[in-house]
UniProtKB/Swiss-Prot annotation:
Residues 1-14 have a biased composition (Acidic residues). Residues 27-42 have a biased composition (Low complexity). Residues 174-183 have a biased composition (Pro residues). Its main location: host cell. The SH3B/LBD1 (SH3-binding) region binds LCK SH3 domain and CSKH (C-terminal Src-related kinase homology) region binds the kinase domains of LCK. Both motif are required to activate LCK. Binds host LCK, human WDR48 and human NXF1/TAP. Forms a complex with activated LCK and STAT1 and STAT3. It comes from Saimiriine herpesvirus 2 (strain 488). Residues 174-183 are annotated as: SH3B/LBD1. Changing F151H: Partial decrease of LCK binding. It is found in: Host cell membrane. It comes from the Viruses. The modification Phosphotyrosine is found at Y114, Y127. This is Tyrosine-protein kinase-interacting protein.
Length: 256
């Protein structure tokens, strides 16, 4: 407990077979990267990293030792992944350097490295006329020159008149055009029947109305006659009853 305030630096080396294999892979990767960097002209050389663990307390528990070993294993795995990336990196870096050199030779001093290739653009498609842009800004469509013409310019003054007779300018050698068939002439009887048929068709409804009215009037007259007969019978019956009552009263008075 006396050495609690002291700080001790310890270098922990792998003791298991897996850790030794990882170290061998790291050494082989470092040699490959040095060879590739020397061939491509790059001065970047990976340096093996040592893991230094600083412990403030001299007495460490077993859990802390296990945690430190896990940290070392993750460090070795990270080194392996970095070595595998560095082996594939030189080819891509070389191609990017070639592209940058090509851009500098062409004299492009812009910051962006994007250069579209094999693209043919028509300069006329990049801008519009002032009238079209003005119409689009107002939400309108540019009119055609034909639409802007006046009514008299577009149509002749006599376009509504019927077609002229071409008989005056007809060439005598040309055959005349066929006319439509002429309707047959009707005789007097046919004409009279047609007229009557037309009259009947036109006067059919009023005739039917008059016939209906006549039937209705006849029915009303029959009803009136029946009602009159019934009334007469009732009056006769009442008169007979009165006579019978009067005669019976007189007969009774005479006997008494």
């Amino acid at each position: 407990m006396a050495n609690e305030g002291e700080e001790i630096e310890l270098t922990e080396f792998p003791e298991t077979e897996k850790e030794r294999k990882d170290e061998e892979k790291l050494s082989s990767c470092s040699e490959e990267t040095t060879n590739t960097s020397s061939s491509s002209g790059s001065d970047h050389v990976p340096v093996p990293i040592e893991v230094n663990v600083i412990i403030q307390n001299s007495s460490r528990t077993e859990d802390e030792l296990q945690n430190s070993k896990e940290i070392e294993l993750t460090g070795f795995q990270g080194k392996l992944s970095s070595c595998s990336e560095e082996t594939t990196a030189p080819s891509s870096s070389y191609s990017s350097k070639q592209a940058s050199v090509f851009i500098e030779e062409n004299g492009d001093n812009e910051t962006s490295t994007y250069r579209p290739q094999n693209v043919l653009t028509n300069l006329n498609s990049l801008y519009t006329t002032f009238e079209d842009a003005r119409a689009q800004g107002k939400g309108m469509v540019r009119h055609k020159s034909e639409d802007l013409q006046s009514f008299l310019e577009k149509y002749p003054p006599d376009f509504r008149k019927p077609k002229r007779d071409l008989s005056a300018t007809w060439d005598p050698g040309m055959p005349t055009p066929p006319l439509p068939p002429r309707p047959a002439n009707l005789g007097e009887r046919q004409a009279s029947t047609v007229r009557l048929h037309v009259k009947e068709s036109n006067c059919k409804q009023p005739r039917e109305r008059k016939a209906n009215e006549r039937n209705i009037v006849k029915d009303l007259k029959r009803l009136e006659n029946k009602i009159n007969v019934i009334i007469c019978l009732v009056v006769v019956i009442l008169a007979v009853l009165l006579l019978v009552t009067v005669l019976s009263i007189l007969h009774i008075g005479m006997k008494s």
